Amino acid sequence: MYILVLTVPLLGALVSGLFGRKIGEKGAGIFTSGCLIISLSWSLLIFYETTLNFSTTYIKLWRWLDSDLVTAYFGLQFDSLTAVMLIVVTSISTLVHIFSTAYMDGDPHVPRFMSYLSLFTFFMILLVTSDNYPQLFIGWEGVGLCSYLLINFWLTRIEANKAAIKAMLVNRVGDIGFVLAMLAIWDQFGCLDFASVFNIVALAPSDNTTLICLFLFIGAVGKSAQLGLHTWLPDAMEGPTPVSALIHAATMVTAGVFLLIRSSPLLEQAPMALMVVTIVGSLTAFMAATIGLVQNDLKKVIAYSTCSQLGYMVMACGLSQYSISLFHLMNHAFFKALLFLSAGSVIHALADEQDMRKMGGLIRSIPFTYTMIVIGSLSLMGFPYLTGFYSKDLILELAYDQYYLAFAHWLGVFSALLTAAYSLRLIYLTFISNTNAKKEVFSQAHEGSWNLTLPLILLALGSIFVGYLTKEIIWSFQITLSPIIPTSIKLMPVIFSLFGAGTAVVLYHYSSRIFNAPTSPVGLAGYTFLYSAWQFNYIINHFLVQNVWRLGHLITFRVLDKGVLELIGPKGISQFMIRLTQEISNLQSGLVYNYALMIL
């Protein structure tokens, strides 16, 4: 049962990838979706056994690293953390597979697409079930590879090529941090499996543990798109919309947060690293919320909301509230997948149009999709008693208790205001405002088939009820919850969210009568700064990439390639041989007495 949850998605990927022409588009969709349904069923049984019955399971399959220096087994670990992640990964992936069978209808490469999705799911399951760092790193690299393949699925588009390469290269920076962390762990502890490392971590010097945690956090920053290495995430929207839902809701971006939660015994021995994690998480939540406020691409608005919510999860890890971070990760998966798939339904209805300025008035054409996006947006905003309310507000309450990190609480609260503002802006521009769509496109907009709408219904139910149904299970993992927070602080996120939503409605409905900020010098400068994503791409390209390129051209190309290596390589050898042959040819003078002298 335990191994099947891992192998069945791999079987679906292999069959769809190798025999796609034999089974056809429908066959590939049905087979891969069926494999994921089986995997989801086993995940539910594993959740019942490990989480509800408190039965942790370890499975050693084979020894795959065996030397005098290090020994590592290929093994599986099923505990409460793994069980929750399996539910999230397999449920979201199953619904994305079903949605893709309709969304990708007519594409000539559907079997390849379904194969990539199943392979993506397999590597994520491998990542969350690993019992040691090297095996986790295999899944870590696997989801990175699959994200490259899926973002670049429409490989004839130059923007998709650039986005896929960017995602791969930016994540390489984080991967280097992860590799350095593994080397430091092995050097410090002499082992790489979780159980051994966590049992002896208290004996290690705090400085070494802090260094290990910072290296691990660099890996998490790359994968979970935190401040500085977040630039690949909005560009990943070049892939098909189901890919965006899978990457942002259940797989790749959650891997970094999972790494922090899994490594929590290490982080608890490094207070300085926890402070860095909190600072970066809170700044990411605020930064991404401000950028999402001015984006015009429907999918990019949701992408930046993902980045902001990941900041909340990382901030919770920095506050040592790992169970609450996992709770928000699980809740976020449902309403974020709902938002992305609903956005895919809108794009599908408008003949692949993604610019919100060219939409509007769709509430009459696709009312079902409108309802789904409203549910997802309200849950994202933390509207009372929806799924997001139980975890997002709890993170902010717990941040209030940290006096030396009080700024994290206020950044989080203000980010909640901005989240409500850009969520209402998305709804208003897409569905309520006067339409700017082309007449022939707008007149033909309609809801999709059952396999487009069924996943949305199930995700909507999750976005409404999952938080309420699972809060007692997740909260039971916590040792303590602060009982002294004033009621006003508890209500503050909701009040700020309602204020942000109301402000967005007023500004977009009556903006022409109130003010003309975007055309004023200050408003234009602020809008440009936010729309350009705080100029991060310019800063990275101008100050980092170009200088590295110049340095590489000067040292690697001119000094080494065209200098030292040429002298001791082909150019030096050729010049030496030419001189040698000239010296030898000079001996052949044609004079008899010279030859006689040489003989003597």
Curated annotation (Swiss-Prot):
Catalysed reactions listed for this entry: a ubiquinone + NADH + 5 H(+)(in) = a ubiquinol + NAD(+) + 4 H(+)(out)
Gene Ontology BP annotations: ATP synthesis coupled electron transport; electron transport coupled proton transport
Membrane-spanning segments: 1-21, 27-47, 81-101, 110-130, 136-156, 178-198, 200-220, 241-261, 274-294, 301-323, 327-347, 366-386, 404-424, 450-470, 488-508, 520-540
Gene Ontology cellular component annotations, sorted alphabetically: mitochondrial inner membrane
Protein name per its UniProtKB record: NADH-ubiquinone oxidoreductase chain 5
Alphabetized UniProt keyword annotations: Electron transport, Membrane, Mitochondrion, Mitochondrion inner membrane, NAD, Respiratory chain, Translocase, Transmembrane, Transmembrane helix, Transport, Ubiquinone
Disulphide-bridged cysteine pairs: none
Main location: mitochondrion
Pfam families xref list: NADH5_C, Proton_antipo_M, Proton_antipo_N
UniProt keyword annotation of Electron transport present: yes
Domain of life: Eukaryota
PANTHER family per UniProt: NADH-UBIQUINONE OXIDOREDUCTASE CHAIN 5 (PTHR42829:SF2)
InterPro entries per UniProt: NADH_DH_su5_C, NADHpl_OxRdtase_5_subgr, ND/Mrp_TM, NU5C-like, Proton_antipo_N
An example molecular function term from Gene Ontology annotations: NADH dehydrogenase (ubiquinone) activity
Family: Belongs to the complex I subunit 5 family.
EC number: 7.1.1.2
Entry membrane topology: Multi-pass membrane protein
NCBIfam families: NDH_I_L, PRK06590.1
Compartment annotation: Mitochondrion inner membrane
Function text: Core subunit of the mitochondrial membrane respiratory chain NADH dehydrogenase (Complex I) that is believed to belong to the minimal assembly required for catalysis. Complex I functions in the transfer of electrons from NADH to the respiratory chain. The immediate electron acceptor for the enzyme is believed to be ubiquinone.
